[in-house]
Amino acid sequence: MPIQQLPLMKGVGKDFRNADYIDYLPVNMLATPKEILNSSGYLRSFPGIAKRSDVNGVSRGVEYNMAQNAVYRVCGGKLYKGESEVGDVAGSGRVSMAHGRTSQAVGVNGQLVEYRYDGTVKTVSNWPTDSGFTQYELGSVRDITRLRGRYAWSKDGTDSWFITDLEDESHPDRYSAQYRAESQPDGIIGIGTWRDFIVCFGSSTIEYFSLTGATTVGAALYVAQPSLMVQKGIAGTYCKTPFADSYAFISNPATGAPSVYIIGSGQVSPIASASIEKILRSYTADVLADGVMESLRFDAHELLIIHLPRHVLVYDASSSSNGPQWCVLKTGLYDDVYRAIDFIYEGNQITCGDKLESVTGKLQFDISSQYGLQQEHLLFTPLFKADNARCFDLEVESSTGVAQYADRLFLSATTDGINYGREQMIEQNEPFVYDKRVLWKRVGRIRKNVGFKLRVITKSPVTLSGCSIRLE
């Protein structure tokens, strides 16, 4: 009577619309590569969210300010330093943030606004006309960053970007402020810094600029580095983030079907699986441009989080040695989009903003609920062949005993990879019972193929591994 081991890191099923095989990704569960009880890894629920404070509105952006050793967060119409208000921010959309020795900058409503640490607020504008310095057509600010002693920002709808003056950050550089990413005639979509380079992200190329070291009045301070240019573009202003000592981004449909890439030494490496590309392809270019990417690290997980209008996708670099490992985050018992955004390590905890309500939260590892509400966790096994076999003892290793009350695990089976049948309820957690078995003794006879779905609804953390079944 052979015992078959079933992986839980990624299920396999079929798409009923086109008969293609697809991946069933874990929902609210992270894979951890660690030898546990004859398994090469286990799956752990994504940390829960507890309320931290009330704020002025939904989250619009966050940055860790190294000059002040504090987290600056834009929520609603306010700028927060930690949990205290320090300024008003116009508009309601996503904002870009950067900081320097004297100010925290926010790119909002086409302006670069500097919230100085002495309490004053300045907006970047041209020098007075009687100063004798060059007057620039500054236009509308699209994205901002900072390198060394200067802020840099891209001008919306053009291939131009500007730098601020060294002495007065509220004005462009008095002699050489304007530069152009000439490979991007449709305009710079986003701007960032990598090591000592300014990085300009367009729709079809990514261009790098380095300091020239020139000291002559009027000489160019930055020059393009064509050896580092990448022949891919980004989908939207916030569809990029620093990740793994480089940048990760969602590619623009201008360079083919969108995917997720990591830049490395003038080349790009794809990290998206076919199922992730199918999800990205389901969005139009305009909707995909509203995506937001961020990175997060905890407990040896290196996470890349992609917030899309209908999905939140997570790539875990630490468990992707045998192929890209993705999972899906969601809120509630249905397919509502995950509500937390703008994660950042603050003090000794990870804090986050919210997409739905005027609150900030913090990740807690001893719960899986979100603001006190139960969450659904889904795992799938691949389809496997069991021709005319009788199946017994479907068992999952579970780390139990921490629940406040008895939780149940819902098991269901599919024979076609599309439809899952009636759910079998099995107790999978109980207070202080640390060695509880999760066991379905009599599964039944299998005609041809079979796959299983595991569903847990709980407020407690979930840890599952080692799914096995006995065949006769």
For the regions a language model picked out, list residue spans one by one.
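Beta-sheet repeat architectures centered on beta-propellers
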Residues: 1-102, 231-246, 253-472
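Beta-propeller and closely related beta-pinwheel folds
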Residues: 47-58, 84-93, 122-292
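Acidic surface patches and DE-rich sequence motifs
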Residues: 65, 116, 155-156, 202, ...
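Residue-level signature of beta-propeller blades and closely related beta-rich strand-turn architectures
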Residues: 77, 110-111, 157, 204, ...
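Hydrophobic or amphipathic alpha-helical targeting/insertion segments
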Residues: 96-131
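Residues that form or flank phosphate/diphosphate-binding pockets in enzymes
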Residues: 107, 201, 389
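Short beta-strand segments and strand-loop junctions that repeat across beta-rich extracellular domains
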Residues: 113-117, 154-172, 206, 312-320, ...
